[in-house]
Regions:
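Short, contiguous strand/loop micro-motifs
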Residues: 43, 71-72
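PLD/PLD-like phosphodiesterase catalytic module centered on the HKD motif
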Residues: 1, 54, 63-68, 75-193
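Active-site cores of enzymes that catalyze phosphoryl transfer or operate on phosphate-rich substrates
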Residues: 2-55
Length: 193
């Protein structure tokens, strides 16, 4: 994963100078001495920019009847993700969605209204809650899919908006696939509770 992060950040590093070039080439790093994990109950993947949207979309498309998806987001407005949620709910996937309720989170109200109206009309299981702590913002960017024998969780800097998911912003996201007996799975599920 360290190599993936290093390689993924090289393009961003190249554009950090005023003229878009670096005076010297970025160094190649030797990652061969970093041991691979022997834990087959825990896997990590690293995504940047639009690759995050593609992978999340594919995982939502792979959800099945009775599975549950928990979304905790600062912004939820990306049409592709909203459509994936609607299609998954139609297949019998349950959704728990927690959104930012501050003034900064205005797009969330429209997305939440659309999803709740859709759920009521078709009797689908989409539950939307707003995090409300006065002026405090809910700045989380997570999505978890509770499969029968493992958990998939995305966490990083990606808001679920067109700008963040369609290559207009530089974003980083980690995907964790973990068996339920792993500490990270318990920690993630405890966070949502």
């Amino acid at each position: 994963i360290i190599k993936e992060i290093y390689e993924g950040e090289k393009p961003a590093a190249k554009i950090t100078k005023k003229d878009g070039s670096l005076k010297q080439k970025l160094p190649d790093k030797d990652f061969s001495k970093i041991p691979f994990s022997k834990n087959d109950k825990l896997k990590l993947q690293y995504f940047t920019n639009g690759a995050t949207a593609k992978d999340i979309s594919q995982e939502l498309k792979n959800t099945q009847f009775g599975e549950k998806v928990i979304i905790a987001q600062f912004f939820l407005a990306d049409r592709g993700i909203i459509n994936d949620i609607r299609k998954a709910a139609k297949r019998g996937v349950k959704f728990e969605i927690i959104l930012n309720n501050s003034n900064a989170g205005l797009p969330n109200k429209a997305a939440a209204g659309e999803l709740m109206k859709y759920a009521r009309k078709h009797n689908y299981d989409i539950n939307v809650k707003f995090y409300n702590k006065g002026e405090e913002m809910y700045h989380v960017k997570m999505l978890s899919i509770l499969k029968s024998d493992y958990l998939i969780t995305y966490g990083g800097s990606t808001n679920f908006t067109r700008r963040n998911m369609r290559n207009f912003n530089l974003e980083n996201e980690l995907k964790i696939m973990s068996a339920y007996d792993q500490k990270i799975s318990k920690d993630i599920l405890d966070y949502y509770d």
